[in-house]
């Protein structure tokens, strides 16, 4: 989704008591990263970033350790990454990323949320050309020389660096996630959130009234236990 709308959503979420929903989602991301790439954070950049994101959201260390331990357990749930595409009210495009041990439940819930809130689920692949997948790092504001930092990170795959009143956002091709993650750590930058995000190629502006309609769907999606992230083409 566009940066302006992203900040609006972040500000709104900060006012809600979402910890009861957030911690299980962070734990699930840690568990999946550990299962896919190993339980040693030093050898697994996705796990390092998942842990850093959890810490930035004040998730207790015991919860983090438990999530990693579950990944290596014999009885660990088979959690799958699931991807859905759809349209919200007023034609806004939506990509939904889920992690679930029960895809049948998840697809039923996602379809119901779309249909009850003025949207529809599309065939996967329908929106591929409308978005570009990027490695995106949300960091605490940087007090140093941004041009120098940009030059230092280009060799690691940096494509865009943007700082606003709230944070520093660094992005690159999705294949550069590991290299950028390591370079950011080397620079001592403070990570708030990192992952692979879908960035709209042509963001679209909507009126306040239209955004209110669209956000009803987005709120319901983000409240679902299996939904990890929601991306839109809203500017």
UniProtKB/Swiss-Prot annotation:
GO terms for cellular component: cytosol. Coiled coil: none annotated. Its main location: cytoplasm. InterPro entries: Integrase-like_N (IPR017856), TACO1_YebC-like_2nd/3rd_dom (IPR048300), TACO1_YebC_N (IPR049083), Transcrip_reg_TACO1-like (IPR002876), Transcrip_reg_TACO1-like_dom3 (IPR026564), YebC-like (IPR029072). It is found in: Cytoplasm. Keywords: Cytoplasm, DNA-binding, Transcription, Transcription regulation. It comes from the Bacteria. GO terms for molecular function: DNA binding. Signal peptide: none annotated. Pfam families: TACO1_YebC_N, Transcrip_reg. GO terms for biological process: regulation of DNA-templated transcription. Belongs to the TACO1 family. This is Probable transcriptional regulatory protein CJJ81176_1187. It comes from Campylobacter jejuni subsp. jejuni serotype O:23/36 (strain 81-176). The lineage of its organism: Bacteria, Pseudomonadati, Campylobacterota, Epsilonproteobacteria, Campylobacterales.
């Amino acid at each position: 989704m566009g940066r302006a709308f992203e900040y609006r959503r972040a500000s709104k979420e900060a006012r809600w008591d979402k910890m009861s929903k957030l911690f299980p989602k962070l734990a699930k991301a840690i568990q999946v990263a550990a299962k896919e790439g190993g339980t040693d954070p030093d050898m697994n950049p996705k796990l390092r970033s998942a842990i850093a994101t959890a810490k930035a959201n004040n998730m207790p260390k015991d919860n983090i350790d438990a999530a990693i331990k579950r990944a290596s357990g014999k009885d660990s749930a088979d959690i799958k990454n699931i991807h859905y595409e759809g349209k919200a009210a007023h034609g806004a495009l939506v990509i939904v990323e889920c992690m679930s041990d029960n895809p049948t439940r998840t697809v039923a819930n996602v379809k119901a949320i779309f249909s009850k809130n003025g949207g529809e689920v599309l065939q996967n692949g329908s929106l591929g050309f409308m978005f570009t997948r990027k490695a995106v790092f949300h960091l605490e504001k940087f007090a140093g020389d941004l041009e120098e930092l940009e030059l230092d990170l280009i060799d690691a795959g940096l494509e865009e660096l943007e700082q606003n009143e709230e944070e520093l956002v660094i992005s690159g091709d999705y294949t550069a996630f590991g290299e950028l993650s390591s370079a950011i750590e080397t620079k001592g930058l403070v990570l708030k959130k990192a992952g692979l995000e879908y960035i709209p190629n042509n963001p679209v502006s909507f009126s306040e009234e239209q955004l209110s309609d669209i956000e009803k769907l987005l709120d319901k999606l983000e409240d679902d236990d299996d939904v990890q992230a929601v991306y839109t083409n809203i500017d």
